[in-house]
């Protein structure tokens, strides 16, 4: 009978050890997956080029001599444009002027409304980079404001 109790103790010890190893493995795997999802080298590299400056409004970042605001709310293209002006009278939806600027904005997140941009090579109003976007600017999306650009009326894009 004593041997039978020892067998249960050994079995319980193996189960507990197996559970501990499983928990450690799962926690390690989750950390690796989280790191891959959150830590993207291209974002880290481009964010280093963006920083907060005293001459930019509060909660705006400076990039390429522009003050940029990334919205957290969703609006149509026209509403986003109006919201930019409400945030700062000298702002509008950002006009992307260089491939590096486009890369920087894409590395942060896609699906933002932006103003007209020759770099996007769009031929008609309301063209988009994002998947499943409407072609008339009525889909509610986040938007990017800038204090140094003035997009033309009725031209909208998302990145």
From Swiss-Prot:
Organism field: Vaccinia virus (strain Western Reserve)
Q: GO:BP terms for this protein?
A: positive regulation of natural killer cell mediated cytotoxicity; stimulatory C-type lectin receptor signaling pathway
The entry's protein name is: Protein A40
The chain's Extracellular topological domains, given as residue ranges, are: 31-159
Higher taxonomy: Viruses, Varidnaviria, Bamfordvirae, Nucleocytoviricota, Pokkesviricetes
Q: List the PANTHER family hit by this protein, alphabetically.
A: C-TYPE LECTIN PROTEINS (PTHR22800), NATURAL KILLER CELLS ANTIGEN CD94 (PTHR22800:SF252)
Q: How does it sit in the membrane?
A: Single-pass type II membrane protein
Please indicate if the UniProt record lists Transmembrane helix as a keyword: yes
Source organism's superkingdom?
Viruses
Gene3D superfamilies noted in UniProt: Mannose-Binding Protein A, subunit A
GO CC, sorted alphabetically, is: host cell membrane; membrane
What InterPro entries does the database record attribute to this sequence? C-type_lectin-like, C-type_lectin-like/link_sf, CTDL_fold, NKG2/CD94_NK_receptors
Q: Which residues lie on this side of the membrane: Cytoplasmic?
A: 1-9
Major localization listed first in the record, in broad terms: host cell
User: Where found?
Assistant: Host membrane
Residues of the C-type lectin domain: 63-159
Q: Name one Pfam family in it.
A: Lectin_C
Entry's transmembrane regions: 10-30
Q: Which SMART domains match?
A: CLECT (SM00034)
To which protein family does this belong?
A: Belongs to the poxviridae A40 protein family.
GO molecular function term, any single one: carbohydrate binding
What does the UniProt keyword field contain? Early protein, Host membrane, Lectin, Membrane, Signal-anchor, Transmembrane, Transmembrane helix
């Amino acid at each position: 009978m004593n041997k039978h109790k020892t067998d249960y103790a050994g079995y319980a010890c193996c189960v507990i050890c197996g559970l501990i190893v499983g928990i450690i493995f799962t926690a390690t795997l989750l950390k690796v997956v989280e790191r891959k999802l959150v830590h993207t080298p291209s974002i880290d590299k481009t964010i280093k080029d963006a920083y907060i400056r005293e001459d930019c409004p509060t909660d705006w970042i400076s990039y390429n001599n522009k003050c940029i605001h990334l919205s957290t709310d969703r609006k149509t293209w026209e509403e986003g444009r109006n919201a930019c002006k409400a945030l700062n009278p000298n702002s509008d939806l950002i006009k992307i002027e260089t491939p590096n600027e486009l890369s920087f904005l894409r590395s942060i997140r896609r699906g933002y409304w932006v103003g007209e941009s020759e770099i996007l090579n769009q031929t008609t109003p309301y063209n988009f980079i994002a998947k499943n976007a409407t072609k008339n600017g009525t889909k509610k999306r986040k938007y990017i404001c800038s204090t140094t650009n003035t997009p033309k009326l009725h031209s909208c894009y998302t990145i």
